[in-house]
A protein has these predicted regions:
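The substrate-binding groove and active-site-proximal loops of carbohydrate-active enzymes
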Residues: 1-11, 51-54, 113, 163-169
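Active-site beta-loop-alpha junctions enriched in small/polar residues
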Residues: 1-5, 34-36, 83-85, 110-114, ...
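Active-site acidic/histidine proton-transfer and metal-coordination neighborhood
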Residues: 6-106
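Histidine-acidic metal/acid-base catalytic patches
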Residues: 25, 65, 69, 91-105, ...
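A near-ubiquitous, low-amplitude feature marking generic local secondary-structure context
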Residues: 43, 47-50, 77-80, 111, ...
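Glycine-centered flexibility sites
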Residues: 75, 85, 110-112, 168-170, ...
Length: 226
């Protein structure tokens, strides 16, 4: 909540989790702005999410950089998660955040959220590869995303309708993504995310589908999975 909390307050709020993650030897703490977001509001269209100007995001990035350095000094890298419905949603938002922040702040690169937000997955990956510390492999169903946008529906409507799905079940080329990660010697986590209605998409079946697809594309990219 860095838009509404000052530096000291925000550090106080996240300190317990940061310390816990250090104790657990976690790869990073994933951070996203949870104030001024519409992602949890069923009646608010995702198209109505708050938007900041370039200068406003640069100012925000400076503040986030201080928090990221505070985390780093405690032994925990901080990776920023761009998210639908929030102030950092589309490709411009991500570019401005990265341009305006210090190297203390890394990026949690989420394929599904970026494409849903209208961004270019490969261009963003190639541009900010050296800042990516954590990766979310999430696919989307473009027809559902199109319906959500055109009919002014909410982010939660999108989740329930099945806008997101596991890798290999949507439209994102995860072979190309994996090839780029391998080329940049990425060695962090790849997390599968695909929040959707379990009545329509049985969790075990879809988890298995996503896992098998990731194993296949990573093997072809010579990206080892440990």
């Amino acid at each position: 909540n860095s838009l509404i909390n000052d530096f000291s307050k925000e550090c106080e709020v996240i300190s317990q989790q940061v310390d816990q993650f250090v104790e657990l030897s976690s790869p990073c703490i994933v951070y996203a702005e949870c104030s001024n977001t519409v992602q949890g509001e069923m009646q608010t269209p995702v198209n109505s999410r708050p938007k900041l100007t370039r200068d406003e995001i640069f100012s925000y990035a400076s503040k986030i950089s201080e928090i990221a350095k505070w985390c780093s000094d405690r032994g925990m890298p901080m990776a920023y998660h761009h998210h639908m419905g929030s102030i950092i949603e589309n490709e411009d938002d991500v570019n401005w955040l990265m341009e305006g922040s210090s190297s203390d702040l890394s990026l949690c690169f989420d394929t599904g959220h970026l494409l849903f937000g209208g961004g270019d997955v490969m261009a963003t990956l190639d541009r900010w590869g050296d800042r990516i510390h954590h990766v979310h492999y999430k696919d989307i169903r473009p027809d559902i995303v199109k319906d959500i946008r055109e009919n002014n529906k909410s982010f939660l409507d999108a989740v329930i309708a099945g806008a997101f799905t596991v890798p290999g079940d949507g439209c994102i080329d995860f072979q190309a993504v994996s090839n780029s990660l391998a080329a940049m010697s990425y060695s962090g986590w790849i997390v599968v995310e695909a929040e959707q209605d379990p009545a329509k998409a049985p969790p075990y079946d879809y988890s298995k589908m996503g896992y098998e697809h990731i194993v296949k594309v990573c093997k072809m990219a010579d990206l080892s999975i440990n």
